Amino acid sequence: MLEIKNLSKKYSGKTVLDNICYTFESGKIYGIMGENGAGKSTLFRCIMHLEKFDGDISVSHPHKIGYLSDTPFFYSFVTGMEYIEFCLKASNISIDKQKITALNEKFALPLERYATNYSMGMKKRLMIMTLMLQDYDLVVLDEPFNGLDLAGVILLKQWIKQMKEEGKCIILSSHIISSLTDICDEISYIHNGKTVANFTGKSANEIEMEISKFYLEFTEI
């Protein structure tokens, strides 16, 4: 599905990603953890080819990748409905307003209002809802739980699990360890641009203990 080989990225001479290697398979959910500035968002932006990088990234179906940025952006004077319609048209998907309305019964968004006037949580819900209306083989979600209320988190987790059942590949980042252990098959910890630990079948407490050891080692150097 997605293979990353020797991925490196520098900004103004500073190394942000250092020889990263991953293999992400279909039908699995992958979590990426790391402190602020560890390189998580840069990794995702490289996967989406929004950044230049050294190394190789190969994707089975490069035109069927969905992406949720950690910083929602909307043009001025575009309503929630217009944003959805624009994204669907860009993906050559027919607009089914009945389907949109039915899905919005769960999200409860004022689609007639300008999206720039939405709260951060509402903007995040609008972007997630738009992704749900499209058919992707690979979905990359950068801090998707940030700004969501409990209902939004539940809806998002249900959708992620559904995509896994459909054989999709999902990669997401979060600072909330339990949010990842609840749904992820594998979790990686990035520190200073390097993957320093991988976890499978570990509880949130076990991962926190392991990460604490790494953090103490790094701060003592």
Which stretches of residues belong to each language-model region?
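Conserved structural motif at the start of ABC-family nucleotide-binding domains
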Residues: L2, L17-N19
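Conserved ABC nucleotide-binding domain
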Residues: L103-S119
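The feature captures the beta-strand-to-loop junction immediately N-terminal to the Walker
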Residues: M33-E35
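Catalytic Walker B motif of ABC-type/P-loop ATPase nucleotide-binding domains
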Residues: V139-E143
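Q-loop/switch helix immediately C-terminal to the Walker
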Residues: T71, F77-S91
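H-loop/switch region of ABC-family ATPase nucleotide-binding domains
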Residues: S173-H175
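Helix N-cap at the start of a conserved alpha-helix in ABC-type nucleotide-binding domains
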Residues: L150-A151
